[in-house]
Amino acid sequence: MLQKTKGIVLHTLKYNDTSIIVDMYTELSGRTSFLVPVPRSRKAAVKSVLFQPLSFIEFEADFRPNATLYRVKEAKSFYPFTSIPYDPYKSSMALFLAEFLYRAVREEAENRPLFAYLQHSVIWLDECREGFANFHLVFLMRLSRFLGLYPNLEDYHTGDYFDLLNACFTSTRPQLHSSYINPEEAGRLRQLMRMNYETMHLFGMSRAERTRCLTIMNDYYRLHLPDFPALKSLDVLKELFD
């Protein structure tokens, strides 16, 4: 059955000389895989250049019951980027976040609040002109709410440890595992949780501090998501914003 929907590109893979497989997070059906024809004709209904990391696509596809790949018939951009592909910092963030979402978001069902969050966040990054060095940290922290992984931050007291495995603060160092962060870093985590896109530029961080926060968040997700792999784009992102 032909249906129109919108999607955010997470991953592409060459299928053969005339097709690619594109994983998108869609407004209609959540995480979904599509077979996309990429003919060389300028008049083609689908162009491969559309499917860059985090690109917004409006498309029509044949959603057949029990299929694992849905064929895309027509596609176009519904929000052409103005800065992300042309800014090396933003494009590196987009590459990392697309890979992160590809590995973390597996739900194959409609989740319009999550789609709206992704759309709002990526458009915000594209339109922002300065002060976005902490964007990926805020994005990942807020994403945890949608995945049911948001940590319990209500019972924080100065000097607490943060237990990564049990997602909570604790006054004593965990004895049964080593997945925790020390009190000094736990205090910074709470500070990070107060950030949003509009205020994050007020929280100054060195590259080392930002890298450490990213490492902690990546470790946290790997603890709580089965089979979450090491991300190839993580090291590239750590080198940004000296």
Swiss-Prot record:
Record family assignment: Belongs to the RecO family.
Is Metal-binding tagged as a keyword? no
Encoding gene (name): recO
Is DNA repair one of the keywords UniProt gives this record? yes
Q: Which GO terms describe its biological process?
A: DNA recombination; double-strand break repair
Checking InterPro entries in the record gives: ARFGAP/RecO, DNA_rep/recomb_RecO_N, NA-bd_OB-fold, RecO
Q: What GO CC annotations are associated with the protein?
A: bacterial nucleoid
Originating species:
Bacteroides thetaiotaomicron (strain ATCC 29148 / DSM 2079 / JCM 5827 / CCUG 10774 / NCTC 10582 / VPI-5482 / E50)
Spell out the PANTHER family in the cross-references.
DNA REPAIR PROTEIN RECO
| UniProt name for this protein | DNA repair protein RecO
**Signal peptide feature range:** none
Q: What keywords does the record list, in alphabetical order?
A: DNA damage, DNA recombination, DNA repair
Q: Which SUPFAM superfamilies match?
A: ArfGap/RecO-like zinc finger (SSF57863), Nucleic acid-binding proteins (SSF50249)
Q: What does this protein do?
A: Involved in DNA repair and RecF pathway recombination.
